[in-house]
Amino acid sequence: MLKIIIAIAVIFILAVILISVLYHFGFIDFYHPMKKTDKNQIKIACVGDSITFGCTVRNWRKNNYPAVLSNLLGEKYCVNNFGYTNRTAIKSADYPYVNEKLYRQSLDFEPDIVVIMLGSNDSKENNWNKDKFINDYCEMINSYLTLASKPKVYVLVPPPLFEVRGKVMWQLRKDVMDNEICPAVKHIADKLSVWCIDMHSVFENKQELFSDGVHPNAEGSKLFAQKVYEVIKNEV
């Protein structure tokens, strides 16, 4: 009996340690703490996938790019992270962002500014369709543009995908990202007359700023936030 109790205790401790490690590096994304705002703050919704959420970033709650952006902007702004791992712009893909409760929460937040970046997960072979990507992403962005708060929308071109040990992780496709998704995002921004921030160019040849070739590390998140900060401050 004592051995069983000890075994259960060991399993419990290991489980707690594993969960803590996964949480620390942003692999557990069911927890989305939202900041409360006062009426004088400018509200910013950062919408996207695991890159926005901060997956693989050490101490993700502090070092995800929306958190860093919040620190750069200061108390005049309320920045909330609406990133959700593995989500797509394409509605017929495996995990569409618009199907999630978090999407509705981002709309209900009634932001003054929306910073949105999707596309990496759309590059998967079983997901990718250029026409659907453009149509569905335009529809999603329009859902923010038509909010009563009339937010400014900044669409981010996703960063490059880098090979690790000869391949890109998470079944993402570099050729689709480089040759189809990046041009499509720029086309969407132009079509909807919204701001476009080209993170693909910002991170070109900067593989050292990525933890797994896909997700920026803490230093990469700082650069990510800095570029968004510079554009927002120049436009506000």
Language-model segment annotations:
Residues 1-47, 51-59, 67-76, 108-109, ...:
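N-terminal secretory targeting modules
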Residues 19-20, 27, 61, 80, ...:
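A general marker of short, structured functional hotspots
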Residues 20-30, 53-63, 92-99, 139-142, ...:
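Short, mixed-charge, low-aromatic patches
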Residues 98-236:
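Alpha-helical cap/lid subdomain in secreted, periplasmic
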